[in-house]
Each structure stands twice: as structure tokens, then as C-alpha cells.
């Protein structure tokens, strides 16, 4: 998709489709009102005839409009003007782009960003439009044969209508950021949607290495199992023992800041398939465990977005990648392993493996002397039980960091909800035979998982994002979502400001 600004009068505007807004009770937004006057009240008459009230998400596609320069006009309901909030605006955009995609238009011009959405600026409104349009256009066809290929949408260009060139700067910022975030989300979705027999730890490492060749400021390296053994990463290596696929620790280092500025470290769980190990998962929906690497995919996608934007800060991405399968050499319940930090771990459940690969990555992160560390993982089904599939779970040891992530989530609508990690919960992780157990019983499962990780994050500011409920959709719309790329990138944009 191509995005740009367009400064033109309605009389001279030429496009396959012009997208304009209408508020509830058929009150036209400014561009729609001007267009209606140009068409002698046609739009108002059609809204009334078709009983379109202008509720958020209403749409009316008008073909064969007068003048011959504009082929179609898409009227989009925005709801009550005084109640237009983020949720309503996003609903309206999604509805508009669904109709636009199916309209056959190759080129469209949008004026929806002219409406006020709280205190949001033009750059934010443009970003939302691009992210939602790219999400709506996304199609994962890589694993289908040629005979199964359907007809792709014809839409190839979207322009944002401006009253004056003086309005261009924030819109162009929104385009630049929106495209970078959308590209990062697409990369994360593509990696997540690949099957486990294709997207192995080695494949994930190869994709990261390719990314490193695309951007001058990005250096990518991969630690092999022999390197991990030298470092004492016994927890990470133990998870890989049940698989024929060797583990990898992918290191992405983006240097956008001058001098020796400390980096922000993002860690993403990269379990390319999780059968549960000896503590085998139920067969139903086990295919979705290919998504257990979406934390790693999200970190790789976020790093790509940062590199594309050229943000003036340093960012390190760490992706511990492995499979978790049952085998004669796999972890057994009751086994004890020694982590890189020297902490011994009793493995009471081999299906609580994500925290085992993350804890060694957290210890490894210390060598970068980070400003802050954020780990991202599809860690616990308990988080879905607690929060559903709308927000990601947020836990951490630094209030300011957690507040910054919360604000970034509100900005992007990639929201989080903070949960406690009080010392009280640490009691559940006691082991009679090791320093810590890898599970804490059925109560507060997402919290005790974070409490486990917190033991390896005492030397820096740290936050944990449990994306088990947000990284992919199940059911008829099954597929990776690309979250939390928008959240992570917004957090870094805010730090670079």
C-alpha cells in the first residue's frame, strides 16, 4: 500500500472513492457537508432514503456521483459528535475499510481525520487508519497452493485530504510511524502464522539475520547451544532437550543513539511449538501452540519498526527460541536445573517452560546495562481467565515503567492491565529440593509466573507482558494479531521524544 497527503479542492479532486464522515442524526462532517452542497443535497437525501442514521460503524457507498471526477463516495457513521472516542473512531475506520476493500476501488482519498477524537492529534488519527487498513488487507497465503489463491484486493493507494499544505507535517509523521508499525505487525503476524514445521528456532534466527542485512544500524547475532552451555544457561537448554531442533538465542542490537547511551531491552519468548513436553497438553487446539513464539515475533517486529523509523535510541532484542516436545531426553516433572543466574529450579510441570527460557534471557540482558527490560510472552492461560482477550497482562518491579507502558497502550489501543506481584505470592513458588519451583499451584497462575521471572530481574527496571490472550485470535478468524508491536513501539517513540 502507498500512503500520501493530498491538498486539493473538492471541485478538482479526482479519485475512485472519497471517504467522508457523518455524525448521528445525519449531521455531516465538514468535508461531507461541503461535498453535499456541491452535489445539491444528494448525500443528505440518500442518507435519509436509506435510513442511515450515522451511528458508529454505519456505512453507505454512493456510486455514480455527479461531476465524473469522483467515482464513489463512502459515507461513514461516526456516532454522536460529542461522544466520538477512540473505540468509536476505530470501529468507524474498520467498517469503512471493509467496504472500501470490497468496493473494487484502486485509489481512495480519506477525510475522516478531520474530526475531533478527544485530544488526539492528526498523527495519531492517521496511524490508526493505516494500522487498521493494513490489518484489514492482511492475507496469509504463504502455505496455500496456487489453485487456492483468491483475488487480492485492488486497493493500492490511500491519500489523506488536507485543506492546506501547512497541515501536512503531523499527517506525514502519522504516515511514517503508521507504516513502520504496520510493517512490524505484518512481520510478527507472518512469523506467528507459519506452522511449527516451517518456523523452527533455526528459521526464526534466519529471518532475524535477514533483517539485520536490511538496516545499517541493526546488528543481529545468534548464540548456539554450545554458547549457551558456556554461559551456563541450563534452564533454556533443558527445554530444548526434548526436541531435535537446537535452541537459539537471537540477539538484535539496534544502535540509533549517539555515543554510548544505555539500551532498552526487549525479550520475546520464542517457543516455536509447545506440546507441553512430558506434561503433555490436550490434543484439542494444540495446533495453536505454534503461536507460542508470538512474543519473540512481536519483539522482532518491533525492532524492525524502530529501525525503519530510525528512532534515536538504542534497543536490544533478545529472543530465546526452542521447541517443547516429549522425548526420552526431555525434562521430567521433578527434574532440577541450574539457571544462568545460579538459581536452581525444580520443574514440577514441563508445560511451564516459557519461564525457563525467559529467566536465562533475563540474566543475559544484564550485560547490556539496560535502561529498562520488557519481556513479552504468551506465558499463561491463567491470564486469559483473569483478563479475557482484550488487554495484555502487565506486571513489573518499577511503577514508572509500568505507567509508561500503560500510557503507551492507551495511545495505541493495544492496552494492558496491571496485576500485582506482591511478595505474598512468592510463597507459592517454594520448593523442598531447589531454590524455586517453576509453578505455584492453580491460584494466580499469571501472577506467580511473573513472580518467578522477577527473581531474575532484580538488577534492573523490569516489566512483563503476558500476551496469551492478545497475541492471536482463535475460531473462524484464527490468526496472529501482531500485538504487542504497537504498544512496544509507542513506548520507544515516547522515550525518544
UniProtKB/Swiss-Prot annotation:
Superkingdom, taxonomy of origin: Bacteria
One Gene Ontology CC term in the entry: cytoplasm
Broad class of where this protein is predominantly found: cytoplasm
Entry EC number(s): 3.4.11.1, 3.4.11.10
Cofactors that this protein relies on: Mn(2+)
GO molecular function: manganese ion binding; metalloaminopeptidase activity
Keyword Metal-binding tagged: yes
Subcellular location: Cytoplasm
Keyword Plastid on entry: no
HAMAP family for the chain: Cytosol_peptidase_M17
Function: Presumably involved in the processing and regular turnover of intracellular proteins. Catalyzes the removal of unsubstituted N-terminal amino acids from various peptides.
Name of this chain's protein: Probable cytosol aminopeptidase
Gene name as annotated: pepA
